[in-house]
């Protein structure tokens, strides 16, 4: 079963992040991701970056992922 820590490590390995927090029950996950890479990007483009970091896991192992994607300045 996929754990929140698995998802966190996968995101961190594929995307330069200042902060990643993931919670979930093994299929449904919620994530807060802070990255300078999100500067100037729409929410859709930000989510696409995260999906890219997750690769095939997003289809095979994760039923649902809710994301809050922020830049460092948006996080405050």
Where are the model-predicted features located?
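Residue-level signature for short turns and capping positions that connect secondary-structure elements
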Residues: 27, 36-38, 72
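A generic structural micro-feature
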Residues: 23-25, 43, 59
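N-terminal first-folded block
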Residues: 1-27
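C-terminal structural segments of small proteins and small subunits
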Residues: 47-76
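A short interface-forming secondary-structure element
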Residues: 33-45
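A short acidic, often aromatic-flanked loop/helix-cap motif at beta-alpha or helix-coil junctions
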Residues: 28-30, 75-76
């Amino acid at each position: 079963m996929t754990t929140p820590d698995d998802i966190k490590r996968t995101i961190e390995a594929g995307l330069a992040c200042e902060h990643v927090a993931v919670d979930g029950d093994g299929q449904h996950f919620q994530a807060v991701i802070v990255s300078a890479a999100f500067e100037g990007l729409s929410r859709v483009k930000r989510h696409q970056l995260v999906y890219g970091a997750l690769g095939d896991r997003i289809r095979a192992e994760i039923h649902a992922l809710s994301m809050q994607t922020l830049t460092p300045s948006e996080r405050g």
